[in-house]
């Protein structure tokens, strides 16, 4: 009777769905390093400028086209 629960626990530990904390940390570090290398950070000002340019060229509204 003890054999079945032990087998199930060992099966769960050996399954690929069980996450390995070290692997997860390494993957997170690699993703972070890749994003830093690719300089994937968005500059909020450039996004706002892009939206304003699109709004001004498409809708020609005074709100979008106003220069400060």
From Swiss-Prot:
Post-translational modification: Contains 2 disulfide bonds that can be either 'C1-C3, C2-C4' or 'C1-C4, C2-C3', since these disulfide connectivities have been observed for conotoxins with cysteine framework V (for examples, see AC P0DQQ7 and AC P81755).
Comment text on domains: The cysteine framework is V (CC-CC).
Secreted among keywords: yes
Expressing tissues: Expressed by the venom duct.
Pfam families, sorted: Chi-conotoxin
Entry GO CC: extracellular region
Signal peptide: 1-19
Protein name per the record: Conotoxin Ar5.3
Disulfide pattern: none
Molecular function per GO: toxin activity
Residues making up the propeptide: 20-53
Compartments it resides in: Secreted
Family: Belongs to the conotoxin T superfamily.
Source organism superkingdom: Eukaryota
Keywords annotated in UniProt: Disulfide bond, Neurotoxin, Secreted, Signal, Toxin
């Amino acid at each position: 009777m003890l054999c079945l629960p032990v087998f199930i626990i060992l099966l769960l530990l050996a399954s690929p769905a069980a996450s390995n904390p070290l692997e997860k940390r390494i993957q997170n570090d690699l993703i972070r390093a890749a994003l830093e290398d690719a300089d994937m950070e968005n500059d909020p000002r450039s996004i706002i400028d892009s939206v304003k340019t699109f709004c001004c060229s498409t809708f020609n509204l005074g709100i979008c086209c106003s220069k400060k």
